[in-house]
Amino acid sequence: MKISEIPAFAGRQAWTEIRGYYKLLLMTELIYKEESYKIIGAAMEVHKDLGAGFLESVYQEAFELELQKQEIPYEREALLNIFYKGQKLKKRYSADFVCYDKIVVELKALGELNSDPEAQILNYLKTTGLKLGLLINFGSRSLQYKRLVL
């Protein structure tokens, strides 16, 4: 296959040839890279000290203390408005944290992550217009986190 025969994709990209096969390399930049690294670093600090096995509420309290210590701006239990056809609904979402006024952070204490919390964060992003959500799981032996971008 010639490089000219490979279909085009949206976004910045590059193709590399490996043993006669072409592989697409997406050249994406992380949004809010520095801010998200700081938030994940704060979560790692909490997990390093507490480990796994506590309730989600314990991790939320410890994470809030770590955000304060590292001077990361946040709002806890941030109420997120929901709109339907331009009208604000009475029902609102409550995100665990919104950091830097632009990153939704949802904490979990699950043995393994499943797709439910991901869908929850994507709904938060859709309703607020924010672009980045971080799903952080303290319940496993190693800290787990996912970046969700809308």
Q: What are these model-predicted stretches?
A:
Residues 17-50:
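Interdomain/boundary linker segments immediately adjacent to catalytic/signaling cores
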Residues 88-93:
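A short, glycine/Asx- and small/polar-enriched loop/turn
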Residues 108-150:
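Nucleic-acid nuclease catalytic cores
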